[in-house]
Amino acid sequence: MKILVTGAGGLLGSTILSLFKDTYHIVGYTRNDLDVVDYKEVQKKISFENPDIIIHGAANTNAEECEGNKNLAYNVNAIGTENIVNAVLQNNKNIVLVYLSSTGIYGAGKNSPYTEYDPVSPTTVHHKSKLEGEKVVQNLNKYLIIRTGWLFGGGVKH
């Protein structure tokens, strides 16, 4: 089984690479290796790698930067995700896409755990752009959306 990870330079992407490197054939792309906003580049790399699973973690997670530059947030988080989805559809419909989203799409917090049936009401540009990414991912037959909260570890200061 071959796994391709986008966002491999991030906290979660690098951890996934480290955890699975001895078990699976896993390839990671950082933002320097793959510009998800460039559809031709995305299509070419997915076609070349021909993975069974794509774990799509490439995103702009800097909330302040997203608020200050809505286009940048949407380009990476929504259009970049759309490019991944379209490349999957063009290359191999059997690829499973795992999309790393955010619990922030729910909006204001609540006192009990969220479920996939809870209504979404994102309040920030970052979370709105992640929700747009989720909508695109749902055009695939084989996908998993993981909505993470705050992530800690890996020597990264928060």
What are the language-model segments listed below?
Residues T6, Y29, I54-A58, L97-T103, ...:
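SDR active-site strand-loop-helix element
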Residues Y39-V76:
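NAD(P)H-binding glycine-rich loop region in Rossmannoid oxidoreductase-like domains
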Residues H25-K44:
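Adenosine-cofactor binding site in Rossmann-like domains, unifying the SAM/SAH pocket
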Residues E64-N71, A108-S112, V156-K157:
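Conserved catalytic-core motifs of eukaryotic protein kinase domains, centered on the activation segment
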Residues T15, L19, A87, V136:
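Rossmann-fold NAD(P)-dependent oxidoreductase module
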Residues I53-I54, G68-V98, L131-E134:
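NAD(P)-cofactor binding segment of oxidoreductase domains
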Residues K2-K21:
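N-terminal Rossmann NAD(P)H-binding glycine-rich loop of SDR-like oxidoreductase domains
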Residues N75, G80, G104-I146, W150-G153:
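Catalytic helix-loop patch of NAD(P)-dependent Rossmann-fold dehydrogenases
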